Each structure stands twice: as structure tokens, then as C-alpha cells.
């Protein structure tokens, strides 16, 4: 068991993270199940490789910066009419959901596997955004203001958040020749899909944020 985990953990984590990217928006239950498997695999690998794990100082400083940000955000969760609910959302968004970074930083060392995860993310975002545009054109299952959320029943705000996150990343990957050709092509496809997706999503915030980022990056 130990030798199998040490030998295959990198590939298993790569596959699980890719599957999670492709399933969470359409099925939260399945996405959370896969996410739990990622955390479990990470914990098992940490135990078996506990004497080998080392975190570079360059990464540690970002970790401490993130902890500082959490301490700054935490009071906003505590100053609420329903502290139980806001605290739950705080830990879900800023702690639980961020744990996926750990296996990527600690155990996925192959650049090919990292590029594969990035390509999967770009392709998925392109398809997700195109589905929102199709929903908008067909008038299917639209939210308030005629806005589309993508993936049939996707969240409008969730899509807007992902568009704001993914658009500048895809723009950088498309322009940076250091990335492999297939990553840059997936980024270009993602950019095309996300432009149409922003049209379907009708989020003024995503248009404004991505417009500013587009000018700054290019």
C-alpha cells in the first residue's frame, strides 16, 4: 500500500483534481465527493512521505500572507446577525476550498501534469461559458434580468466569479510563449468561450474587471 501510494499519488491526484474541475459546477455532490478523495489522498501521502516533505521559503511567505488575509477577513464573519451561518461560509470558502492547493504544491512536481490540470481548467471554462451563452440565446432557465449561469442549472454568481478568475489566467497563458502549445491553444479557446459567456452571464462586474485586466495584461 505504501509503495503504491508513493509511486502513484502524483498521477492519482492529477486525475482527481481534473475530474473535480469538470464536475463540481454541474454536480456539487459529486464534486465534493471527489474533493474529499483528494484531501484523503493528500493526507495519506503526507503520512507516507512525511520525512520528504519540504516547503520552499518562497511558498511559505505566500502562506503567511494568506493567513494574514484570513485574520483580516474573519471579523466580517463574526460581525453578523447570524454568526453561525457566516462563520460556516467563511471556513467553507476560505479554508476548506483552498486545501486543494496543498497537493498541487507538495506532491505534483511534474510540469506536464501541472500543465494538464491547467489545460483541463481552460477547456472546461470555455465549455461552461459557451453553455451559458447558449442558454442566453435559447432563453432556457434564465435567472433574474435574463442572466444565464451555464451548465444547465449553474449559479449565475458562481459563473461570474469563475469568469473573473479564469479570464486573466487564460490571457497570460495565451500570450506567454513559455507555456506549451497545447496549453496556449486551450487558453485561446477558453478566452473565446468566456467572452461569449460574459455576454450570456450579463455580469457588469466581470466585464469591468476583465476589461481592465485585459488592457493591463496585453
Segments (PLM) and residue ranges:
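Residue-level micro-sites within transmembrane alpha helices that shape
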Residues: 9, 24, 31, 75, ...
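Aromatic-anchored transmembrane helix interface
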Residues: 62-70, 84-107, 115-125, 129, ...
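Alpha-helical transmembrane segments of multi-pass inner-membrane proteins
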Residues: 74, 113-143, 153-218
